[in-house]
Amino acid sequence: MHFFWSTGLRSSSARRLLQLKRFQSTKATTSKDNKTLFTYGKDGHYFLDRIDPTESKFSKILIANRGEIACRIIRTCRAMDIKTVAVHSDVDSHSLFVKMADEAICIGPAQARLSYLNEDIILEAVKKTGAEAVHPGYGFLSENTKFAKKLADNNVEFIGPSSKSIQDMGDKIHSKVIARKANVSMIPGYDGEVKDEVECVRVSNDIGYPVMIKASAGGGGKGMRVAWNDKEARENFLLSKSEAASSFGDDRMLVEKFIDNPRHIEFQVLGDKHGNIIYLNERECSIQRRNQKVIEEAPSVFLDKETRRKMGEEAVQLANAVGYYSAGTVEFMVDSKRNFYFLEMNTRLQVEHPITEATTGVDLVHQMIRVAKGHKLRFKQEDIGVRGWSIECRVYAEDPYKSFGLPSIGRLTSYKDPSDIPNVRCDSGITEGSEISLYYDPLICKLTTFGKDRQAALATMAQALDSYVIRGVTNNIPLLRDIITEQRFVSGDISTKYLPQVYPEGFKGKQLKDTERESLLALAACIAVKSAIRDRSFKQSTKGMAPKNYGYEVKLGDFKRHIRVTPTEKDGVKLFEVDMDGKQIIKIDDSFKLGDHVININFNGQPFIMQLFKMDAIGNVTLIYLGTKYELRVLPERAAKYMPIMPEKKQLDLASVLISPMPGIVKSVSVKVGQRVTDGQEVCVVEAMKMQNKLTTGRAGVIKNIRIKEGETVEDGKILIELE
């Protein structure tokens, strides 16, 4: 976790040592061209933001959040020599953030509304522990006006903006009125609340399709849907309204013009209680699925200096209009001509804040805490530059082959992040053995890289993703790894429609060339040889000399080669000479072990990195290459001769059953046994991580059997409904 410090610093003396180190090490070094140089990653990178040990501070802060953001806040608190209190649900009792905090209190069961969203029980924890301030992180109560006011009424500092600012900007209907008065560029739309689906259709026709239907209190992509016609307006209004009530406890809806194919660019603002406010430049957040960000970067390849200045100044205008202080983010839609339109303001720390920290040298959590204590900002707008490039990939427990990422659950049986690679930062709240549950966001890690330019940051990201070991849960690394080398992304030609445009049939995994397939086959054969040699050494009764070479038929789908592997050694260096169908020889380093998750070797002298996901005793070898998992079959030559006569396994008729594409909770079932249905008709809704997913039939027919009921928890792959 690796972000800058060890997770074991609980003693005050250790914290003071860390604080002094941070204070002393923040003098920036400069090169001959006066560009600031720093190393990003474990050792810290806040060259513009020293911690002053003589400055007044809170003695104890309660963190009203969980997971990676709680860990992130604890780290800065440690550097400031501030004690921390973690509040947690019962299922989080063994989580990393609980272990990292100085104190921890259980506040209820797994359901967020009974624990992390329970304002009164969190306030009780504040009183019990004597915490002077509360940091809400992001999500949960971070933009809850009532919670911020309750804390103020109890003389507890809310580490964020005032409750009035939260109210003004949190209500997306009211925020648009304020933004228009502040001369901020606006999207055409309807300024009032849309009460029901009938009014939604009327307003949508007045604005003109397509429209965006969104929750007034929404965020994180929840409660948002696009409608292209009256039918979609009715359906999506009801789904979004239900989702908003479930996620935010507020089902008010608004409708605005949908700008097709825009960029999503946001500006970080930071203000104090003395009227000083600045912008810390932009973050490009256009790579999204279901209106949720997947990859972010700073700066944006699209903005020129003048557009950056105009957008930043409008963000500050809006913040000034509501007397804003603390960290906040103003989000804009930007069209192809660099026209920009206000979207919303998030009155909290953003998930993607690390990329801003990397390119500005500012610790946003440190500044939020300082501002809450009443201190002035120590830097002005002219101090904020753009230094280098930073990219963040959100590593989720999701299946990227299903709608670019439907949630996955399970236990992390093996886990090693790539934080040992220079210029890599891993913000995570999990360790090996952690459980990814249905109840919370499926984020595993925010993987962030830094470089002198975009190309360098992307190269480091590729290495980091290739080296990231995650076992036990399905994850979205295959999609992330493919995106960062895809031609359009590399050129900077992106928009919020990037994923459906680049992958119109959905993500299918890395598409390999024949030479890449042959490399996989060759390595799988070498793994089989190492396994055979190991097995032979364990069998004491084995007689005779070991074979000089090993012959196999290796298959990857329909692609196969006959391979002969000869182990050799020259000048103390062990090699495998791999004969591929008698046409070419590949030399592969014999420097890896069968127990290695990550295999860094040379193919004909060129560096090559793969992961060995699993292997078994009957020749099945699963490799991970460029993020994608490949299942190979390695058979000795004699065994391969008998495979054509083996019986094939009978396949399930998928057109006659509806299978849950993810783990979740059944919110509704809209059909009955014996009912005739059409192709594509909605039959049920399954909710996971507060996102509602409408499931439809794959063909016309009659409902034969319904295996579920409302409120039931279902697993990924469970048969829900059968058709005759």
List the model feature ranges, each with a label:
Residues 2-330, 334-353:
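N-terminal beta-alpha lobe that positions the nucleotide/phosphoryl donor
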Residues 59, 222, 299, 441-447, ...:
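Short amphipathic alpha-helical segments
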Residues 84, 133, 142-150, 392, ...:
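Structured, non-catalytic alpha/beta "coupling" segments that mediate domain-domain communication
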Residues 315, 354-588, 682, 716, ...:
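Catalytic cores of soluble metabolic enzymes centered on carboxylation/carboxyl-transfer
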Residues 379-387, 499-503, 507, 629-660:
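Long, charged amphipathic helices and adjacent flexible linkers at domain junctions
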Residues 450-456, 461-473, 647-661, 665, ...:
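Conserved bacterial/organellar gene-expression machines centered on ribosome-associated P-loop NTPases
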Residues 649-724:
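Structured functional modules or segments
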